[in-house]
Amino acid sequence: MKKVSIQVCISNKQNDVPIRIQSAKKLVLYCLQHWEVHTDQVYIYFLDDESLAQLHDEVFSDPSLTDTITLPIDSPGTSSQPHILGEAFISPKAAIRFLKDRAEDSDLLYEEISRYVIHSLLHMLGYDDQTPEERKKMRVKENQALCMLREKHALLSD
């Protein structure tokens, strides 16, 4: 991987799924490089369900559980210094709930959490998922990124 000067800040404040910080940084850097995104900083927070639901309530006045919250900060192409792409707040436990009995397969579990990170990065880049067409377009980009990351052995891991 070519050296890029993007500060990827990862915080793991949950105990449901072990997350390797370096693995998460690698995933983010590969995606941003693949998409030719130029930014100075991006923040990814792995939270427990309670913390994410509380944030969901604070930001969107909706206390329900969710898998990820993305807060884009600086749009790609803007010239702020430093350029901060955004913040993503992700619940690894949501992947366990989604996969149900298949969550015992750690490869599937980490692939699903990787999808959440990719999904959040796409939101930071301006992709939306409010309509069926937008969801389809986003899912295609997510799947392309997952394929690229699989080839490079850069999916999240424990």
Swiss-Prot record:
Binds 1 zinc ion. Its main location: cytoplasm. GO terms for biological process: rRNA processing. Pfam families: YbeY. It is an enzyme of class 3 (hydrolase). GO terms for molecular function: metalloendopeptidase activity; RNA endonuclease activity; zinc ion binding. Its cofactor is Zn(2+). Disulfide bonds: none annotated. One of its GO terms (cellular component) is cytoplasm. Gene3D superfamilies: Metalloproteases ('zincins'), catalytic domain. Keywords: Cytoplasm, Endonuclease, Hydrolase, Metal-binding, Nuclease, Ribosome biogenesis, rRNA processing, Zinc. It comes from the Bacteria. It is found in: Cytoplasm. Zn(2+) binds at residues 119, 123, 129. Its EC number is 3.1.-.-. Belongs to the endoribonuclease YbeY family. Single strand-specific metallo-endoribonuclease involved in late-stage 70S ribosome quality control and in maturation of the 3' terminus of the 16S rRNA. This is Endoribonuclease YbeY. It comes from Chlamydia caviae (strain ATCC VR-813 / DSM 19441 / 03DC25 / GPIC). The lineage of its organism: Bacteria, Pseudomonadati, Chlamydiota, Chlamydiia, Chlamydiales. The gene is ybeY.
